[in-house]
Amino acid sequence: MSVIRALHRQLVTKERSAEEIAREYLERLAQLEPQLKSFITVTEELALQQARAVDARIRAGEAIGPLAGIPLAVKDNLCTQGIRTTCASRMLEGFIPPYESTVTARLAAAGMVTVGKTNLDEFAMGSSTENSAFQRTANPWDLTRVPGGSSGGSAAAVAADQAVVALGSDTGGSIRQPAAFCGVVGLKPTYGLVSRYGLVAFASSLDQVGPFGRTVEDVALLLQGIAGHDPMDSTSLKVDIPDYSQALIPDIKGFKIGVIRDLLGEGCGEETRAAVQAAIQHLQELGAEILEIDCPSFRYGLATYYIIAPSEASANLARYDGVKYGLREPADSLLSMYGKTRAHGFGPEVKRRIMIGTYALSSGYYDAYYLKAQKVRTLIKQDFLKAFEKVDVLVSPTTPTPAFKLGEREDPLSMYLCDLMTIPVNLAGLPGLSLPCGFADGLPIGLQIVGNALQESKVLRVAYAYEQSTDWHKRRPPLGQPSVKEGQGSDPGQPQAKRRSGKRSKKSKS
């Protein structure tokens, strides 16, 4: 059952109050935080304030929506007015935005309870959340392994019941890959379906905000709360938003599902391949027609992405110069200040990608690299369009392997290969979802479901049908009992963590 629906029922029947629920999640968050390090900032005071406001509405007899009173975690690259937004970078360590991102504003208006800002790879550049300037987040299933990235803090928080749902951003797989590693559901919406206003930019033509949840329905409900046109975002689509909960039908008889042959071959681990093939067989047993699909351009997706994304990043990150906001290193000249600020403010991976992007955009190399990459991007889009002439959705593994050990992949190329299966979806701007489909040595494996543009409903329907006929989503990491799904108490055996203030003021600290 959806966690959101279960809690909503408890709230409207007055079985429990929003403040009680918020306190239990905050307690569990504090208990597990020394082990997981999912959060950069915990907004306890804000959460309790928002929860009390929901309780006041209920006492007044006001009807509340399904998201009201639900604990939410927010990736720390989404601007939150009065609460620092660091992007896990020394460059923005003390930055307190004077405005609110559209998605967080919409969820606050819906009555959600923000428990904190989650850890990520610096400026969302990474696949393991090891590139954070502040801390390394651990995977709740195995504390010696990564949670994925760049939205690793959000995925870990949902998997460990530190929050009911969370927001992440996905540029090359940064929602789907950590969702797979942490055994939760994560959705990257169609590019432009969700506003990017207030999202600190990495690669503007690829970035998209999306939801994490323990179930497909939780993700659908959160997507409902954030989707829709925003005049503050020039890339926002003017389209009607369907009721995504209406797509949650456990019947896919007659659906045509394409298996991306290119993503099940070389580079895919044996255990992952076996789990995904079993999931495909299960979808067939549910009545879907399975077709094999060739997408030959996908093999060039990784190289294409690592030209386009760093090129856009090099332009976007040029604004961090020590003049307007963020870190400023003392220096005896303007040029020296630029150099010292950027040298001390950015971590190694961010510097690497800025250099790659600057090189690709430089005179004499623009045509050979950037322009050619854009042409290949068009070919990838065309391969998807051809595939969707034959099928309703496409499926593949989300990641080549389950979560790897912390510190295991020091070579940048081996880290980049983690996003091999998710990157083409970003290049084409399509919706993609990951949900659990098995385990290997106690670690979750993710199934990726991809739809045509604005076909989130089809993606959610197939995911829901699979989820409702399996029990992978019901498994929990070995971190004690969940805090409030069924009104259970939190695990008293975990150490207490220091609480941190989260007032909407310039005094917010972590």
Curated annotation (Swiss-Prot):
The active site is at 75 (charge relay system), 150 (charge relay system), 174 (acyl-ester intermediate). GO terms for cellular component: glutamyl-tRNA(Gln) amidotransferase complex. GO terms for biological process: translation. Its EC number is 6.3.5.7. The keyword Protein biosynthesis applies. One of its GO terms (molecular function) is glutaminyl-tRNA synthase (glutamine-hydrolyzing) activity. It is an enzyme of class 6 (ligase). InterPro entries: Amidase, Amidase_CS, Amidase_dom, AS_sf, GatA. The keyword Protein biosynthesis applies. It catalyses: L-glutamyl-tRNA(Gln) + L-glutamine + ATP + H2O = L-glutaminyl-tRNA(Gln) + L-glutamate + ADP + phosphate + H(+). Residues 497-510 have a biased composition (Basic residues). Keywords: ATP-binding, Ligase, Nucleotide-binding, Protein biosynthesis. PROSITE patterns: AMIDASES. Pfam families: Amidase (PF01425). It comes from the Bacteria. Residues 471-510 are annotated as: Disordered. Heterotrimer of A, B and C subunits. Allows the formation of correctly charged Gln-tRNA(Gln) through the transamidation of misacylated Glu-tRNA(Gln) in organisms which lack glutaminyl-tRNA synthetase. The reaction takes place in the presence of glutamine and ATP through an activated gamma-phospho-Glu-tRNA(Gln). Belongs to the amidase family. GatA subfamily. HAMAP family: GatA (MF_00120). This is Glutamyl-tRNA(Gln) amidotransferase subunit A.
